[in-house]
Amino acid sequence: MIKLYNDDMFNILPNIEDKSVNMIFADFPYQTTNCSWDSLIDLEMFWKEANRILKDKGLVVATAQMPFTAVLAMSNIKNLKYEWIWEKTTATGHFNAKKMPMKAHENILVFYNKLPKYNPQKTKGH
């Protein structure tokens, strides 16, 4: 059975059974704005709970954008295995366009302890 949660993770993680989760897909706040919802979470607490609830071959897949990508990667460098690049169809950051390039991609970081099931996908040009 698949069970999805859409809530503040610190409300639900403590209530999830040990070793019962295959994957956590997270879109953490990147701390790139001054908005109240965009503040850095307690990554140490997150990894403690994630390690408790993930199955042995479970993984965490998380979106990020620099400079948060570096913060997230270093928060669990031991289990960081690889990164995907999410190429966006429309760049963002128009208000800062005179100061820096607009942001046309995000990072997707993949963390795990033991290799989960992986089905390679062949694509043209790769």
Positions of the model-derived regions?
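Core catalytic lobe of class I
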Residues: 1-126
